[in-house]
């Protein structure tokens, strides 16, 4: 992913818990008028979202963008499938990798960059239950060490 990511609107924390993220890609989003307004307001949920390659195009499914509150009867469908904009080489690479067993395309975060909504898309491999427990133990150990240093600094 490029160095300068813009303002992060939404993150998929569950993806980092359930998957090993091997590569990340920056993809543009094809949106309707009221969708970008809802994204700017931060009313988007990536929790159950996933991406698929279909006919040489990448589509994101189950990404929930709430309807725009000031919108009229032409408001968008919150759960519609949305197209992602990637280079052809990236799409071919993702299509080949996603066909392998255990790999998935997972949306990681949505952010604004130069006025455009972008999505960080991760090529991910699923974690087993023991991997999740191991990561949780490591996280707790780091937290205990940080707490011990903080308490020592106070004395």
Curated annotation (Swiss-Prot):
Membrane-crossing residues?
Answer: none
Q: What is its main location?
A: cytoplasm
Quote the Pfam families the UniProt record gives.
SmpB
Q: Which cellular component terms (GO) are annotated to the entry? A: cytosol
Tree of life domain: Bacteria
Q: Which GO terms describe its biological process?
A: trans-translation
Which HAMAP family does the entry mention?
SmpB (MF_00023)
UniProt cross-references to NCBIfam families, sorted A to Z:
PRK05422.1 (NF003843), smpB (TIGR00086)
Q: What is this protein called?
A: SsrA-binding protein
- Native organism: Bacillus cereus (strain ATCC 14579 / DSM 31 / CCUG 7414 / JCM 2152 / NBRC 15305 / NCIMB 9373 / NCTC 2599 / NRRL B-3711)
Give the classification, highest ranks. Bacteria, Bacillati, Bacillota, Bacilli, Bacillales
Chain's gene name: smpB
């Amino acid at each position: 992913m490029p160095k300068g990511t813009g303002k992060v609107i939404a993150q998929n924390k569950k993806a980092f818990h359930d998957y090993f993220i091997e590569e990340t890609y920056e993809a543009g989003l094809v949106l309707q008028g009221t969708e970008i307004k809802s994204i700017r307001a931060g009313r988007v949920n990536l929790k159950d979202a996933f991406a698929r390659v279909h006919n040489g195009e990448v589509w994101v499914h189950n990404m929930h963008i709430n309807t725009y509150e000031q919108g009229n009867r032409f408001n968008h469908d919150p759960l519609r499938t949305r197209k992602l904009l990637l280079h052809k080489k990236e799409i071919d690479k993702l299509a080949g990798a996603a066909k392998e067993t255990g790999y998935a395309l997972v949306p990681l975060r949505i952010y604004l960059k130069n006025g455009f909504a972008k999505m960080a898309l991760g090529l991910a491999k699923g974690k087993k239950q023991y991997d999740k427990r191991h990561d949780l133990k490591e996280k707790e150990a780091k937290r205990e060490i940080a707490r011990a240093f903080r308490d020592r600094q106070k004395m």
